[in-house]
Amino acid sequence: MKTIGFVDFYIDEWHANNYPAWIEETCKKTGADFKIAYAWAESDRPPEGGLSTAEWCDKFGVKKCDTVEELCEKSDYILVL
């Protein structure tokens, strides 16, 4: 399985909330083996409220990385959102 890491200013946003399902659906259709496994955000929470990075990670079954360097080391692919 190839792992994907998400990098964003804050992670609880439209792209990060929708891409995991789209990637999973595409993998099922094509037989590819990718998974959103890691996330890192510069800001812990959107300015208008919402999930913290840790809460988002719990919701999506993703590991929160403490640094962008950690995410880069662990991920096979990186999506900058």
Please give the residue ranges for each predicted region.
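N-terminal glycine-/serine-/threonine-rich beta1-alpha1-beta2 phosphate-ribose binding loop
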Residues: 1-81
